[in-house]
Structure formats: structure tokens, C-alpha cells
Amino acid sequence: EWNKPEDVKKVIVKLYKKDKLEGVVFVGDIPIPMLRKAQHMTSAFKMDEKNNDWRDSSVPSDRFYDDFDLQFDFLKQDSVENNFFYYNLAIKSPQQIRCDIYSARVKAVDNGEEPHAQISRYFKKVVAEHQINNKLDQFFSYTGDGSYSNSLTAWTPETFTIREQMPGVFDKEGRARFIRYNFSDYPKDDVINMLKRTDLDLSIFHEHGMPERQYLSGSPATNRWNAHVDAMKYYYRGLARRKQNNKKSFDEMLDMMKNTYGLDTTWIAGYDDPKVIAEDSLLDLRTGIILSEVTEFKPNSRMVIFDACYNGDFREKDYIAGRYIMSEGKCVTTFANSVNVLQDKMANEMLGLL
């Protein structure tokens, strides 16, 4: 029985040497290495390990398993979440990642369905997809609010790089689709409708994210004074709710509103009214995709790449990337990050190698 990551890695290395193992898929609750002293090998995750909780300041990573050269010093097993094992990257270890094999996880999510039933359905649809001769010729890319610092200059070249990397998707009109967060006030429905397409092969999301949410868009641009006012009130109500449990912080917010912008408390009126809270919550929901919605709309894109923070955080019982593959749709593969990822970069570099 595999009680700790070392047990799993020992089997992997043995198979690699004996049978030239190319990769592994971890099915179920395989021990999760929680890595520390290795933030220099992440693109954006930077958190003080001394003054923050171990769970939050460690990186869940299977590089422990698939990069045989990396060396680690065992620290402890989590006393509450027993599947977590904490390690420091050893001083004598290589300080760069060069994986010897590929690795992936098939992990049930907390959607109310029995875990074994989820995994069984997943493998059935994987087998079904492998039996179909389906070439990659339908592509979709979405760029959310905040990605590339909202630069049109940085966003525009994606069409040219995709054309070079996957020329087949440009053979006919409509095979490659690109949507940006400001194409409409709330592009969420357009994105979901795209993901529901039964012919969609590959999708990429450039966005902000959390384990439980894809952040698609922000507050829509306004061009009339009454819309400006409504947008500002919506923003300050949200700010007030975030600070209401800290009197000092709340008072500082009121001072800032008054002394910097000349705004009185009428601009946050209703921030603690249940009716207004519900209305604001529904408006906020239009700007992103949450876990339950993934299960509802059943994404069919065969592969989805999440160029986003935390959408692939497999230490959680439920997370966006897991919901995609465990849905009843045809999605069978996701590529996502377990922690923060750098936004301002060429995210599609070498994508054509797939």
C-alpha cells in the first residue's frame, strides 16, 4: 500500500528503468507532495513561508514524481489532511525542472456524486474518444479581464502564432474562434455556448482564476453618467462588504472616500441589505464561471488549457479543472496550474509541439 509519496516514486522509477515508462496517471487519492523552498521554480507564486500557513504557502506539485533528478528533504505529514506531505527542495538538488516522464491526475471532485462513479464515467468517455478519428481542427481562445495587462498589442499576435502552430484550424472559416473580455458587457454566455460545441477540440483560457472560479470579465465599460454612478456604487458596496468586519479598515475606507474622492456614505448605501447583496451577487456571477455551472453546461472541448491561477489546484476537494473532466461532457484533458501563474507572457509558446 502507498502510504507516502516515496512509496509511489519508488515504483515509478523502477518501471522507468525496467520498462522504459513514458508517463503515469494518478487515479484517486494518491499522496500529494507539498513543496517548499522552491518558489523560484514557479512563475508567479511568491508567499512568505515563515508567516503564512503551511498549506497556503506550499506548492502541490507532482514534479516530485516525474522529475527524478530533483531532491527533497521530508518535513512532515499534515495532521489533518493526511494525504499532504511537506518537503523542502534540497540544497543539493538541481534548481530547474526537467521532467523524465509526463504525469497527470484523475481525481474525483466534490460534486455530490460517488467518486468511483465519476472516475468510471471518465474512463468510459476517454475510451470512446480514443476510438474516434478526430483531428485537431476546431480551436477556441478566450482572453479575460486583466490578462496581458489588457493590452491589445499583446493580445493581437495570438492569432498569428496559432496559425503557425496549428495551421489546420485555419483551413476553413470558423474553425478558429477568439473572444476577448470586452467584446460584450458580459461574455460569459458566449463562452459557455462555445464550450458546449460538440466539435470543439482545443480551448485556451487566458484569465484570472481560483480553485472554485474562472474570472472571465470585470465591470463593463460605461459611457453615460448614470452608468458611471451605478458602477462606482457597485464597486464601493463590494469594498465595504470586504472591510466591514474590520472597524479600522472600514473607517480608513470611509476616510479615503471622503478625503480623496469627496464621496459620502450614500455611495455604499445598501451594502449590508440582504436584497442588495443578492442583487450584487447575481451581477458578479455574470462575470465568471463557478464549479456548479461547469457540471451544468457539460463542456465538450476535448482539451482545455487554463492559463490562470489555481484552476488546477488538486489539493482541494473540488476545483475547476477537475470539474471539466468529471462532467458529462466530452472534455477528457485539462492542463492547469495548482498555484499562481505569470500573466504577462507568451502563453502559447511551443504549443504546436502538442
Residue ranges with predicted function:
Residues 1-354:
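Cysteine-dependent hydrolase recognition
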